[in-house]
Design a protein with these regions (language model features):
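Short, low-complexity N-terminal intrinsically disordered segments enriched in polar/charged residues
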Residues: 1-35
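Aromatic-acidic/polar surface patches that form glycan- and anion
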Residues: 10, 14, 26, 51, ...
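A beta-strand edge to alpha-helix "cap/lid" segment located at domain peripheries
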Residues: 4, 68-143
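Residues at helix-coil transition
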Residues: 26, 38-39, 125
Length: 143
């Protein structure tokens, strides 16, 4: 599939994948978010925690992580930018990008920005479908 795509077409597929992911994540649709990963994916986003493995593990991790917001009706928005794609020997893609998380509380005009992160993904593209094989998030404040 990717051999026949131009770079612009590949980038459009990847951008749509990430747009779908963040909208699922930000609206609490964790099962749909996890479905954007391969069945055996690895997902590491919390500093000091072991990565979640498999879609079911990703769903559990996200529910556990978001418990901290229970009773506090914040809206979180993930912003991905500066995406770089590099094809691997196995046909998958190493992707790196910057991510910002913006949190808004009801009635408060100014958002809280952070964390700022550097993200490493491995993407598989098959039959026009993009899925994460893995995601590793590095938090800038820990550098």
């Amino acid at each position: 599939m990717t051999d026949s795509l131009s770079f612009a077409e590949l980038r459009a597929h990847v951008d749509q994948h990430y747009a779908h992911q963040v909208q699922c994540l930000d609206s609490g649709r964790f099962e749909e978010y996890a479905a954007t990963f391969t069945h055996d994916a690895e997902f590491q986003h919390t500093p000091g925690k072991e990565p979640a493995r498999t879609r079911a593990g990703i769903i559990r991790e996200l529910h556990t992580f978001h418990e901290r917001f229970r009773g506090n009706p914040v809206q979180r928005r993930h912003w991905f930018n500066m995406v770089r794609l590099e094809q691997r020997v196995d046909g998958a893609y190493d992707v790196t990008f910057y991510a910002l998380v913006i949190t808004v509380e009801p009635g408060v005009k100014e958002p809280v920005i952070g964390p700022s992160c550097f993200v490493h993904d491995v993407l598989e593209i098959e039959g026009g479908t993009v899925r994460n094989r893995s995601r590793r998030v590095e938090h800038d404040q820990l550098l």
